[in-house]
């Protein structure tokens, strides 16, 4: 990868041997290794057995999870917030595992639509809950810095499974909670 970065620098008219760029290929490789590390992560290892028998029936929501990913079309970042909820079916998950699941899929080349679904289906697979809801709101630098240059635009995506898809009351409760944050 480092050699390819040197070639990119040359192709845009830069001198990869100048002081400020000498270590750039190494830094870019290290950054991309981290930003795409989700390809090499097994969700079961992320969850690490942190699933517990519990009779609670109320909605469990982790709000405002920071999301940083790379658009697969331009390799530019998009960033925002994810809200992930589930209705338990006699099992709950350690709350830190939800943001970790988000990170696994965000640390890949992505489109936000697929990212939203991958998170929802991963939670569904791990917990087998009565339902899962994921909403992501993000800003895409590929749309802000280039192309249409719309700096204030945001993309909202959602994936609703089970009770969140089938039951309007459950869906409304989720949407109210992510809008206001109040109970």
From Swiss-Prot:
Query: What pathway does the annotation place this protein in?
Result: Cofactor biosynthesis; 7,8-dihydroneopterin triphosphate biosynthesis; 7,8-dihydroneopterin triphosphate from GTP: step 1/1
Q: Name one GO cellular component term.
A: cytoplasm
Disulfide cysteine pairs (residue numbers): none
Q: Which residues are Zn(2+)-binding?
A: 71, 74, 142
| One of the protein's GO biological processes | one-carbon metabolic process
> What keywords appear on the UniProt entry?
GTP-binding, Hydrolase, Metal-binding, Nucleotide-binding, One-carbon metabolism, Zinc
Domain of life here?
Bacteria
The entry lists its GO molecular-function terms as:
GTP binding; GTP cyclohydrolase I activity; zinc ion binding
Please tell me whether the keyword Nucleotide-binding is annotated for this protein. Answer: yes
EC number(s): the record gives: 3.5.4.16
Q: What reactions does this protein catalyze?
A: GTP + H2O = 7,8-dihydroneopterin 3'-triphosphate + formate + H(+)
Stored InterPro entries: GTP-CH-I_C/QueF, GTP-CH-I_N, GTP_CycHdrlase_I, GTP_CycHdrlase_I_CS, GTP_CycHdrlase_I_dom
How does the annotation summarize its subunit structure? Toroid-shaped homodecamer, composed of two pentamers of five dimers.
* Annotated family: Belongs to the GTP cyclohydrolase I family.
PANTHER family noted in UniProt: GTP CYCLOHYDROLASE 1, GTP CYCLOHYDROLASE I
> HAMAP family this protein is in?
FolE
Would you tell me the protein name for this molecule?
GTP cyclohydrolase 1
Organism of provenance: Leptospira borgpetersenii serovar Hardjo-bovis (strain JB197)
């Amino acid at each position: 990868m480092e050699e390819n970065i040197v070639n990119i620098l040359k192709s845009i008219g830069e001198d990869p041997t100048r002081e400020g760029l000498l270590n750039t290929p190494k830094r870019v490789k290290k950054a991309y290794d981290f930003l795409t590390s989700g390809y090499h992560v097994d969700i079961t290892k992320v969850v690490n057995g942190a699933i517990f028998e519990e009779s609670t029936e109320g909605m469990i929501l982790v709000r405002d999870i920071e999301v940083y990913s790379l658009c697969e079309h331009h390799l530019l970042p998009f960033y925002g917030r994810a809200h992930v909820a589930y209705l338990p079916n006699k099992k709950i998950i350690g709350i830190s595992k939800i943001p970790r699941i988000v990170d696994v899929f965000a640390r890949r080349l992505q489109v936000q639509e697929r990212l939203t679904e991958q998170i929802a289906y991963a939670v569904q697979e791990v917990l087998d809950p009565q339902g899962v809801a994921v909403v992501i709101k993000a800003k895409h630098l590929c749309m802000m810095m280039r192309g249409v240059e719309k700096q204030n635009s945001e993309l909202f995506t959602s994936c609703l499974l089970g009770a969140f898809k089938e039951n309007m009351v459950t869906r409304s409760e989720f949407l109210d909670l992510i809008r206001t944050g109040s109970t």
